[in-house]
């Protein structure tokens, strides 16, 4: 199954992130807050090349379905140019704003210096991260999901080993975690580039400066709505985290660790989303409506089933997960409560992300943007702001707003699926 290697890759990746977070968490709440200050900004940064990865994946999958070999090569070349260009621009911006990020995110005076240094160092390899994200998406579109899995797992193992060396052996603390992230990102980007250039489907015969205008235009048309979705979503996460960070170090640490702990439990949904994007794109390229319908039905059923199981497991192991990341009893207690709450949201979140994958595979990216923007900013952010500033709402209330956002988006994206592509 196309989804399984992607799911395994993400599971192992999150497990490595768990170890990473636990290593920093053992340094204390201030160290956790310093790293967490950059977390949502990092999501925003990563979401930009992800959008162009969707454009690459959709076009390559549809070209494979229609049997257009030359077009596959042309899309691959455009994808490489976009990956480098986007990475260079983002890296330049991040390096310029690095001194101000901690202040924007409301970090305390004790946390701000370490948070600033951490953000600077994880910004250094952004062009390599962009290469890894966009080119891995292109490779997955060929149904080769194993190679990106091996690269991703290797990079995360390297990151954990370097974390241990820099944090504990060299005693570099938060700075050591940043150095480890930087080095592993450079290595994974270079390896992905090497695999991409040697891939049998991507024969880059002409100069990278000779690009097919139609493919470039379609890359923009597909990627721009996804980019707006990701920016609306992740910038919303930044504002959301900023609102929580002003509630105190303990609350922010509990929130950040709980958000990270939950990642493992929605991996199944993201694995099927990536597979649905590829398989729906190929079905559309073949103009095979029956195959498309079968992919949609099986993807939705499998995603909801696996996310329901994930929700049950999250509820059962919530306290153990929080205890793995931190020794602080207040952080553990608060984080356990919100994780048990969000466990009931997992099936709805699964519906939301698998529906997005189906929309992307068909090249229909505008409607998901409208839904994402409305849900994030009108439901989650506005209600959280009002709740905190006018009703003294705590972290539990904040997470209720987040759950409401996910449920509404799931319903609004799932209902139109039957009419997306008619015979």
Residue ranges with predicted function:
Residues 29-40, 115-119, 178, 249-264, ...:
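Small-residue hotspots at the loop-to-helix junctions and early N-terminal turns
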Residues 1-20, 121, 132, 155, ...:
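Transmembrane helical elements of multi-pass membrane transporters/channels
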Residues 2-22, 26-27, 40-55, 59, ...:
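N-terminal transmembrane alpha-helices
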Residues 11, 15-33, 102-109, 165-172, ...:
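Helix-terminus/linker motif at the lipid-water interface of multi-pass membrane proteins
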Residues 6, 10, 22, 39, ...:
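Transmembrane alpha-helix boundary and packing residues in multipass membrane permease domains
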Residues 53, 122-140, 148-156, 177-192, ...:
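Short runs within selected transmembrane alpha-helices of multi-pass transporters and secretion channels
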Residues 1-6, 60-127, 171-224, 280-345, ...:
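Short alpha-helical transmembrane segments in multi-pass integral membrane proteins
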Residues 32-92, 129-148, 254-312, 316-318, ...:
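Small-residue-rich hydrophobic transmembrane alpha-helices
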